[in-house]
A protein has these predicted regions:
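Short cysteine-rich clusters marking metal-coordination/redox-active sites
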Residues: 17-20, 34-35
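Short, non-ligating residues that shape and space the ligands of small metal-coordination modules
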Residues: 26-27, 43
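Cysteine-rich micro-motifs
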Residues: 30-41
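Conserved N-terminal entry element of GNAT/NAT acetyltransferase domains
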Residues: 42-54, 194, 200
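Acetyl-CoA-dependent GNAT
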Residues: 50-119, 126-131, 170, 199
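Conserved GNAT acetyl-CoA-binding A-motif
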Residues: 136-148
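Conserved beta-strand-loop-alpha-helix junction that forms the acyl-donor binding cleft
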Residues: 146-155, 167, 171-177
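Conserved active-site tyrosine of GNAT-family acetyltransferases
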Residues: 158-159, 164
């Protein structure tokens, strides 16, 4: 595997084990089948809002923690998510998740979605996505588009569970931009961009 560059290293995202709560490195994570027997824990309420200047600093930290950088490849382009509008999810006055987006044509593009590992599996990402959908409806946009990578099985699961449909696979899109093949979720090589859509 080629040497990782500073700009496009392996995704440093940290996941939390749903059974024991231990933090797991992205590349070391595994997919497994589990039932819903775990008791549901009531979580503190989530407030989702447009990011303020103070929120943007926290959002940048979340994106850096999740992606290792704020410049990412999405929709076939290299994008700087720091320059995009963002929604933040706040729990106990602390940002626990962030969603960067752009408006283009009749669609809202979800460019990046990051959740603090402490709040994974607590609904933060779902609240952010629901707010993005409300924003698109208020703006009378007809659809939301999402771009992710072939290795990102958690994202593919999440978006499809929320009504998004696979619409396009762009082979080697990420590899062509990064000029390398990096290991992604569970060691799956990151190569392709996968696009999903939800019509409103």
């Amino acid at each position: 595997m080629p040497k990782q560059s500073d700009q496009f290293g392996a995704k440093p995202a940290v996941l939390r084990c749903g059974r024991c709560g231990k933090f797991v490195d992205w590349e070391e994570a595994h997919v497994q089948i589990v039932c819903t027997c775990r008791p549901r824990i009531d979580m503190p309420p989530v407030l989702v809002r447009e990011a303020t200047d103070d929120d943007r600093r926290a959002a940048r930290e979340l994106f850096n923690q999740d992606f290792g950088r704020t410049k990412i490849v999405a929709f076939g382009e290299l994008m700087d998510i720091e320059e995009m509008p963002a929604l933040v999810a706040v729990r106990h006055s602390t940002p626990s998740g962030a969603l960067a987006y752009r408006l283009l044509g009749d669609a809202l593009h979800v460019v990046a979605l990051a959740t603090d590992p402490m709040w994974q599996r607590s609904g933060v990402a779902a609240y952010l996505l629901a707010e993005a959908e409300l924003l698109a409806r208020r703006l009378k946009l007809g659809r939301l588009l999402v771009a992710t990578t072939n290795d990102n099985l958690p994202a593919l699961y999440f978006y499809q569970r929320h009504g998004y449909r696979l619409t396009e696979l762009i082979p080697n899109s990420v590899a062509d931009h990064t000029h390398q093949e990096e290991a992604g979720f569970a060691g799956i090589p990151v190569r392709d961009e996968v696009r999903l859509e939800k019509r409103l």
